[in-house]
């Protein structure tokens, strides 16, 4: 519909903003219902025409916020705190995951056979969340700048992005433990639900039943033992259950857990006994990049100068000069995803900086590792694989192993480096075997649900927030999660 707007002596034709336009603006700008209504009012006033905005906006906003109301339940559950005492916590969860998936497929016009499901687990902003993404297998995204032809809020988001993500369960103000994850998984009843799981390494270890910390058998996917310099036998779900049963029958002594592959809890994965863990669980693209990048940065800090303090000061100055900010997910000196990528690409500048202080010769082997890993990330960690990715992995692995053999105490093989060396190629071959596609690690990346914490926090603060002591807190939190998910359909 076209609306005629008087402007002085001239007349201009302006497209009427539809209800759908406002729903898109509400989502893309992070507006509350009240703010969206105010925006519509300002547009009507500014154009001096009530018809500049399609009627029925208020009703549509309310309807959109409640589209999934019947599919989410609020419960109070008992969670053990650090002192071993039970505390009541609020859990919001989807009471019918299958129906939710069918609703999403219908709303998005997708066929189930042409989609992949991805589950994510992560704690952020005080709450433990379990998320679902439905991804189009043949999705091809338009690149380049948004144009006016795209319309209001016209930028299209990938099917696996934060803006299309569903939060299936939220456990408020709770620790990240085996028991809390178990509560959520059992409520959602995932049996026979075909989905790939990805998360950070700590969470993946919880899911397969391993204890936390510095483990003798720290790989999620195989039975390799420290120093993790060799490829182990890939786990099947039945292997994990057998190890756990043997651990329990031997008395369940955690001091002897290394004799049982560190499997101290029953695995929480719902899959066929003979299924491999690798494939059902995806190597976490983001956390592999963060972990390996941080490891190489710390080696530079510890080995190039006479003291680690000098090394840290040098790296801090270098990062500041490159406008690379610190404070990542691991500690106040670590880097987040984009910053890690910039650090990996800044090797020429890093060479120049070390050469200025006469330390390039000592730093050069690690700088070469950074370059090699940067090539690996470019070819492997994206949504689509680039040619030569297997060679890039092999070259990085060979270079790191050579330094490990020369100095095993410095160039230790962490679980993340082990996964990059031995399991990333295996996984990508599995991922693309049936379809012949060239999908990279980014296809099953955990980045979308890493971002969901800040996205939800913005909405929570913007008109939804109530105190946990509020008498109706559980229902308020449920309505919030329903609205968040309903606006992501």
Task: Mark where each language-model region is.
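A structural signal for the principal folded core domain
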Residues: 1-489
